[in-house]
């Protein structure tokens, strides 16, 4: 038996509120991340990811409060990312109840941050989030044809995305969160070529993100090498349920958690 494929809803949180509107019935407060986390837990999510999109400094304290309240009521693993720049940031999030912390832009500026974090907190706690896209026309060519981006996909980091994922593994991260910026929001399916290339380059788990539009999009991502699949909008707006995604993955011959 292989390892079960994980299904992970992602919530964007701004100053303690869920951003991408959420369409659950019977929720007292659809903007409360804790309410949503509980609902996803009940619906069979294997893990949850919170992405803190708060620009302001004071937002950090609010996020810690959200993490604390979630950890009190939800017992599936919780990953938190967004604005993580230092050991202190990670320490605070883990103490508040996060199980894993994802690091993105700050590692591009200073890759050794990843090895410092994995040495101190353990590889299993540190996720490298990679916002990747095909190199656009006129962009700096990269060996794989894929580049790393920052600022929500608007700026090139002038790094090869596959090489960067590999470097992350060498520096000690336990998992890669692979976001396809080309796929993000399109609902046309995951970028399978990107997934296959990263899968061939690393041996740590890869979470596929960006592009899911329906349940049928998930099994090809798993076949391309994803150990976990992540989506936001389609879960929030009830376009697809977690049970439907797990059903599709199982029907394709892969193992899922009940």
UniProtKB/Swiss-Prot annotation:
EC number(s) per entry: 4.3.2.10
Keywords: Amino-acid biosynthesis, Cytoplasm, Histidine biosynthesis, Lyase
InterPro entries for this protein: Aldolase_TIM, His_biosynth, HisF, IGPS_HisA/HisF, RibuloseP-bd_barrel
GO molecular function: imidazoleglycerol-phosphate synthase activity; lyase activity
Enzyme type, top EC level: lyase
GO biological process entries: L-histidine biosynthetic process
Cysteine disulfide links: none
Subcellular locations according to the entry: Cytoplasm
Superkingdom of the source species: Bacteria
Catalytic residues (UniProt): 12, 131
Main subcellular location: cytoplasm
Substrates-to-products reaction catalysed: 5-[(5-phospho-1-deoxy-D-ribulos-1-ylimino)methylamino]-1-(5-phospho-beta-D-ribosyl)imidazole-4-carboxamide + L-glutamine = D-erythro-1-(imidazol-4-yl)glycerol 3-phosphate + 5-amino-1-(5-phospho-beta-D-ribosyl)imidazole-4-carboxamide + L-glutamate + H(+)
Pathway terms, separated by semicolons: Amino-acid biosynthesis; L-histidine biosynthesis; L-histidine from 5-phospho-alpha-D-ribose 1-diphosphate: step 5/9
GO CC term (a single one): cytoplasm
Keyword Glycoprotein: no
PANTHER family according to UniProt: IMIDAZOLE GLYCEROL PHOSPHATE SYNTHASE HISHF, IMIDAZOLE GLYCEROL PHOSPHATE SYNTHASE SUBUNIT HISF/H IGP SYNTHASE SUBUNIT HISF/H
Purpose of the protein: IGPS catalyzes the conversion of PRFAR and glutamine to IGP, AICAR and glutamate. The HisF subunit catalyzes the cyclization activity that produces IGP and AICAR from PRFAR using the ammonia provided by the HisH subunit.
Subunit structure: Heterodimer of HisH and HisF.
Protein name: Imidazole glycerol phosphate synthase subunit HisF
Provenance organism: Corynebacterium glutamicum (strain ATCC 13032 / DSM 20300 / JCM 1318 / BCRC 11384 / CCUG 27702 / LMG 3730 / NBRC 12168 / NCIMB 10025 / NRRL B-2784 / 534)
